[in-house]
Amino acid sequence: MPVAVIDGQPLHYVDQGSGPVVVLGSSYLWDRDMWAPQIDALSQQYRVIVPELWGHGESGPLPASTHSLDDLARQTLALLDQLDIPQINLVGLSVGGMWGARLALLAPERINSLVLMDTYLGAEPEATRQYYFSLFKMIEDAGAIPEPLLDVVAPIFFRPGIDRESALYQDFRQQLQGYSKERLLQSIVPLGRLIFSREDVLEQLPKLDADTTLVMCGEQDKPRPPAESEEMAGLIGCSLILIPQAGHISARENPDFVNEALLTFLANNA
């Protein structure tokens, strides 16, 4: 997998296919495999780039210069500069949408179209922020994601009632279990705190181009409920698509629906 050095650390990324560039921004705690169905579908006619978050997949630790989601947006722009890519179509899910929207606000000339999936540009509600911070403290103290926490954290990402014996669930649970103490303390926990203490940028959303922006959300997304997506689509003035039979990682829970929606949107905008 290709690598770029950004802010002194190796950032690994997928680069597959040719044509207009589509950048896929991943969720926290997921590596490039989160987008496997979309990489396959989109790379038939687009150049698909998937940067792996710091401390995830093969990417290096969170650079010391990373203090906010704006820094994640800036680091992605640095990657695009290194690759001599002037304009992109950006699809961001969860934190991928959080930094993705900030990138679009920071450098609108670089964004051809924008899809915000299962994400929210407001601040984290105080109750859930405190809850996630309590989980981070437990992980930090243990130097691991303790066994009892695995089946607390993993279900957050899926629709209620997912088969916990399914490969999708078990593979993700195993990945959580496999994080080293060093990776958790250097990258995963600090990045999580950065994400969930983010600033509210809802008032800036009307600056986004409604004609080239789409909001999508899993109908059964627990951490980022559809009401948040409805609020954002209203502020932007863009279309909203609810994804049936899907929770937070909608790209994996209903990949055929997501692929069709993305291909249709990109055909009209990319």
What are these regions (language model features)?
Residues 105, 112-144:
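Flexible "cap/lid" loop of the alpha/beta hydrolase fold
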Residues 208-209, 215-217:
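Short beta-strand/loop motif that positions the catalytic acidic residue
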Residues 9-65:
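Conserved HGGG/HGGXW glycine-rich cap/lid loop of the alpha/beta-hydrolase fold
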Residues 237-270:
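Catalytic active-site module of serine/aspartate enzymes centered on a nucleophile-bearing elbow/loop
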Residues 92, 96, 100:
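Gly/Ala-rich beta-loop-alpha elbow adjacent to hydrolase catalytic centers
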Residues 222-228:
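Conserved alpha/beta-hydrolase "acid-adjacent" motif
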Residues 40, 49-92, 260:
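Active-site loop/oxyanion-hole signature of alpha/beta-hydrolase fold enzymes
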Residues 125-130, 145-207:
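Conserved alpha/beta-hydrolase catalytic His-Asp/Glu region
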